């Protein structure tokens, strides 16, 4: 659920598509995913966020879509020229960059102004890569640091060296599904079956 800068309330569902209610109408309307050309798998709506141009980006199990605030229509966005439809699991807007986390295909950073894309993947042979290619959660703390939750643990992006530092390694079958920051600079890390971890970003 999200309220955009125009006051529109967006409600994304697992199988019922995209619902929205503007400040003026006070009633919910639904974007029919079948009418936009989306396939059945696209009805499984995942993460979403709003960019500086008031466009709403939506991740699905079968690709990345965005809602054009000028034309009030949805469009599919391919992260690669080969028109590969990634399984999008997490989104984070950071300035002009849209961070896109996928299942099994790593992390992709899209510059919304230039259209350039930088991709990051896990490699056992290269140090300081992602913990895993399953990027399930993305979070920017109040200091501006970006944390990446994966199916093997939590890592932090290092902009100076353009790589990643492992913060918490929870191992297999314990995906980092959500990240929350409290007023004491603690990050609360929710996992799929290992409980909750607390990480202090100061100490």
What is each of the regions a protein language model found here?
Residues 1-203:
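Carboxylate-rich, polar loop motifs that coordinate divalent cations or form catalytic acidic clusters
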């Amino acid at each position: 659920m999200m309220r955009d800068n125009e006051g529109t309330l967006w409600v994304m569902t697992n199988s019922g598509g995209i619902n929205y209610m503007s400040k003026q109408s006070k009633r919910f309307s639904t974007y029919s995913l079948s009418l936009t050309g989306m396939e059945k798998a696209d009805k499984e709506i995942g993460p979403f966020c709003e960019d500086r141009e008031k466009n709403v980006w939506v991740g699905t199990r079968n690709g990345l879509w965005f809602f054009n605030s000028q034309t009030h229509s949805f469009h599919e966005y391919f992260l690669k020229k080969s028109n590969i439809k990634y399984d999008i699991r997490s989104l984070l807007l950071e300035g002009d960059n849209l961070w896109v986390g996928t299942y099994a295909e790593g992390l992709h950073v899209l510059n919304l102004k230039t259209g350039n894309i930088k991709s990051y993947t896990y490699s056992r042979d290269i140090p300081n890569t992602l913990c895993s290619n399953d990027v399930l959660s993305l979070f920017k703390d109040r200091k501006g640091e970006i944390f990446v939750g994966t199916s093997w643990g939590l890592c932090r992006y290092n902009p100076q060296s353009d790589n990643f530092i492992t913060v918490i390694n929870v191992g297999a079958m314990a995906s980092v599904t959500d990240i929350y920051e409290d007023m004491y600079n603690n990050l609360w890390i929710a996992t799929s079956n290992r409980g909750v971890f607390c990480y202090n970003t100061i100490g």
